[in-house]
Swiss-Prot record:
Function, as annotated: Non-catalytic component of the exosome, which is a complex involved in RNA degradation. Contributes to the structuring of the Rrp41 active site.
Matching Pfam families: RNase_PH, RNase_PH_C
Keyword Kinase attributed: no
Quaternary assembly: Component of the archaeal exosome complex. Forms a hexameric ring-like arrangement composed of 3 Rrp41-Rrp42 heterodimers. The hexameric ring associates with a trimer of Rrp4 and/or Csl4 subunits.
Membrane-spanning parts: none
Listed name of the protein: Exosome complex component Rrp42
This protein's UniProt keywords: Cytoplasm, Exosome
Keyword match Cytoplasm: yes
Subcellular location: Cytoplasm
One Gene Ontology cellular component annotation held by this UniProt entry: cytoplasmic exosome (RNase complex)
Protein family per UniProt: Belongs to the RNase PH family. Rrp42 subfamily.
GO BP: rRNA catabolic process
Length: 274
């Protein structure tokens, strides 16, 4: 296991930070993009043959793999007629210069929580269809592995999870001779998802008074603020301010900017899942 050093222990040189800030003030970025431009996105599914569903997403140099494992378990007490979703995230030791060997830290936990919240509240997966007889339910375990962190992990991890769920095959529920409910892993069916409700997370960074999409790792070390919106169709299903502060007008501007970024990511997702 590995964890990421807290923001206070990550650093960027003063000169590099000032270069990033000065360029953004003129609506340019150190990698040549404008504030509204995202890096090239690549989505591949079925990349982990031992998983029930999987996908990898590369956004620029940021690289995340998501694997789905299906099991049987007890539903949550407050949702006895629904399936269960569990999301875990791990940053591999070589993913970043600031990754330390150890248990998942607050960032990895937050990453998993944001992804979980977006999927759980959008209707992409109908969890009521995942309840099975005998008081049991399907359990969908999503394991996220950060292969390389060059910024904007939340957006990339979310996209990888959504694509992996679309790729997931559910083992059929059967009863053995003793009447015990179990999974037949030799007989599977696609996990039903509604692609029109796919949750898309879009993070907006703020440096000075400039808002921009898809921050790189260096830009993240220079941020004054960051807010993430998760959209399903034209609705906001989750919002998370992970750094700094935003005025009301900045939140409105960030929302409009995030909507434009959402359209590009959703188009890439649909193209990859055809």
């Amino acid at each position: 296991m590995a964890s990421i050093s807290p923001y206070g222990k990550r650093f960027i040189s003063y000169l590099r930070r000032e270069q990033i800030r000065r360029l953004l003030a003129t609506k340019y970025r150190v990698d040549g993009r404008g504030p509204e431009q995202t890096r090239n996105v690549e989505i591949n599914v079925g990349v982990v043959k031992t998983a029930d569903g999987s996908a990898e997403v590369k956004l620029g140099k940021t690289h995340v793999v998501a694997g789905v494992k299906v099991g049987l378990g007890q539903p949550f007490p407050d949702a006895p007629d629904e399936g269960v979703l569990v999301v875990n995230a791990e940053v591999l030791p070589h993913a970043s210069p600031y990754t330390e060997v150890g248990p998942p830290d607050e960032f990895a936990i937050e990453l998993a929580r944001v992804v979980d919240r977006g999927i759980r509240h959008c209707g992409y997966v109908d969890f009521k269809k995942l309840a099975v007889e005998g008081g049991k339910a399907y359990v969908l375990w999503i394991d996220l592995y950060v292969i390389n962190d060059d910024g904007n992990l939340i957006d990339v991890a979310n996209l990888a999870s959504v694509a992996a769920l679309k790729n997931t095959q559910l083992p059929v529920v059967v009863k053995d001779e003793a009447g015990v409910v179990k999974l037949d892993r030799n007989n599977k069916a696609p996990l039903p998802v509604d692609i029109s409700k796919a949750p898309i997370a879009v993070s907006v960074g703020k440096i000075g008074n400039v808002l921009f999409l898809d921050p790189t790792f260096e830009e993240e070390l220079s941020l004054d603020g960051r807010i993430t919106f998760t959209f399903s169709e034209d609705k906001i299903v989750a919002a998370q301010k992970t750094l700094g502060y935003f005025t009301q007008s900045e939140i409105e501007a960030a929302l409009n900017l995030a909507l434009r970024g959402r359209d590009r990511l959703l188009e890439a997702l649909k193209s990859a899942l055809k």
